Amino acid sequence: MNQPPNRDRRSQKYLGSKGLILLIALLSAFVPLSTDLYLPALPGMGDYFGVSANLTNLTLILFFLFFSLGLLFWGPLSDKYGRRPVLLAGLALYIAASAGCALSWEIWHLIAFRVLQAVGGSAASAVATAMVKDVYDGRRRESVLALVQSMVVISPAVAPVLGAFMLPYTSWRGLFVALALIGTVSMAGGLLLEETIPSRYTGTMKQSVRRLGTVLRNPGFTSLLIVFSLVSTASLAFVSASPYIYQEGFGLSEQWYSLYFALNAAALIAGPFLYLWLSRHFSRRMIVGSGFAVMIASGALVCLFGSLGPLLFALALFPASLMGSAVRPPGAFLMLDQQKEDTGSASALINCSSLVFGSAGMILIYLGGESLVLGLGAINVAVGVVCLAGWTVIGRRGLTKI
């Protein structure tokens, strides 16, 4: 596979440059949109089906698991057959599965359709990150990644609020209808998309999948992959536990929960912009290292003061959310920069690893005892310590240019 150097030169006849960025941002947001929109309804769904919270949470956990596995399938496939056909096939499955979720009459039917929804939606994320590498170079790529990330994290802020305010007028089924409509809008954008891949992999499909191993054998890529994927352990632990912390722990309504959730999500929105501003004055190495240190301090504050009330909890977690989001653009840039070829495979591994570590966080948060607040604080401290240590080792050993 021989890809020429990327240039910011791949015009889109129908979408245009701004339309392409908007489409990439929407595709990248499929994970938070597919999970956060129905978070306010999660406790009520357990009551509707007459099942425990653990079983209801399988609709989240298995979604992340199969989303991550789907990435490993769609990523190499897009290197061989192109981004556009893979995107359209995945979106068709996502739309059909979303409709199936809305029509589910038993919890196991819902879980099955969520698995199919995850597999279809994973094509969107795999293709989105790869298209950034296809089209943009250097500083422009880093800026686009930051812009896309900032737009992506708007969805965790908007989705729970939208979901909470939809619930008085519809049931949880209506939220999955909304996801089907989002998939339809994305499909329209995909139909207008012109192929972005510079050159396609010419080997067999089996050889294409094996390129995942080739990418993982790059020590610079793999070391960065582990460090930056760990951040998702803390962020998705919060996503999983937040409705139970705010609604059952602090006794808030669905609407108040969505507003407090949006406060933390505002930090996610600001993070990439903060990084772009800081990158004009400080080195990437210093910004990322400081971000991990802030996560440690913020996690400690959550442990000390988070149980005293919803506002103190949200404010204590705010710095961790802010800096966890701020380190995402440089992390994605550095990981993509390690691979001159196999962009689809690298993109798949980046997103897959993030979701695998995130799914682990969604499980760990319920294994730490009765206090979800203390558990979340401890996870942030642990993640910050490990990431800071790993980042320091990467810098000292010169595994990659940071």
Positions of predicted regions on the chain:
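Juxtamembrane intracellular "pre-TM" segments in multi-pass secondary transporters
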Residues: 5-14, 196-224
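Helix-breaking motifs and short loop linkers at transmembrane-helix boundaries and internal kinks
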Residues: 50, 82, 103-109, 120, ...
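Conserved MFS/SLC helix-loop-helix module at the cytosolic interface between two early adjacent transmembrane helices
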Residues: 69-108
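Paired small-residue
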Residues: 93-100, 108-116, 311-319
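Helix-loop-helix hairpin linking two adjacent transmembrane segments in secondary transporters
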Residues: 109, 138, 146-191
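Cytoplasmic helix-loop-helix junction between adjacent transmembrane helices
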Residues: 113-154
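C-terminal transmembrane helical hairpin of 12-TM major facilitator-type secondary transporters
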Residues: 286-330
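A late C-terminal transmembrane helix in Major Facilitator Superfamily
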Residues: 336-370, 380
